[in-house]
Amino acid sequence: MSFMGNMIGNKALAAHGKNEYEKAVQLYDEAYEKGMDKPRLLRGYSVLLIRTGHFDKALEVLKKIEALPGLTPAEKTDLHVNYAIILWQKGHLDRAMEILEDEFRHLKNGTMYSIIGYLKIEQGDADAALAFNKEALEYDDTDAVSLDNMGQTYYRLVGDKETAKTYFDRAIAQKSTAIDTNYFLSLYDIEAGDTEKAIERLKTARGGFFSPLNYATPEMIDAKLAELGTKYGRYI
């Protein structure tokens, strides 16, 4: 056990919890170099590495967690879920889904529904995505991510924008800062000619903390804002 590493790791976790991500990364990096070895601290580090796209380093941290003795079933599940996300990002979506669906047989919760629901969309099978995301909403019909997933399913896979919007509207009512929901709703605003509202939504989305589980990227949002600024002669 590394007293110093874990002490710094606790500071990193506290910063992480306050959404001070840049500070958290710096502290996690230092803590890891000093031997941080508490599962919950390493988990926090791995999550932040995944969210910031440092997948090889995240995989290294996950392997360190896996080697620790006495992991609880919940910690093992969390490990497998994060490993699956890395696999997906490295181009192995089907293998990632196998791992997630195996875990899902033993644990059904909002997090699992939201992750698998989104990856079902990424797989591109509209019927499978609709069926799973319908089940997710039967589990919790107020979950913002599951509502957004259903909206994306209709928008991206089915091509039914009218039905999609009903889910995006419900999702934004649950989480007004949601990156993807704001992005998609901005597209409706643009079609309706409400440029002001579209820009407001895009700026809200741009201010979020992105992860691999977001459809919209900072680059996509910046491009859309630039397009609106050029088209309507605005300074954005």
What positions do the PLM features span?
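TPR alpha-solenoid repeat register
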Residues: 41, 75, 79, 112-113, ...
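Structural marker of alpha-solenoid helical repeat scaffolds
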Residues: 34, 68-72, 105-106, 139, ...
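Structural signature of tandem alpha-helical TPR/SEL1-like repeats
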Residues: 18-26, 52-61, 90-102, 122-135, ...
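Canonical tetratricopeptide repeat
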Residues: 10, 44-47, 78, 82, ...
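TPR/TPR-like (Sel1-like) alpha-helical repeat modules
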Residues: 67, 170-176, 187-213
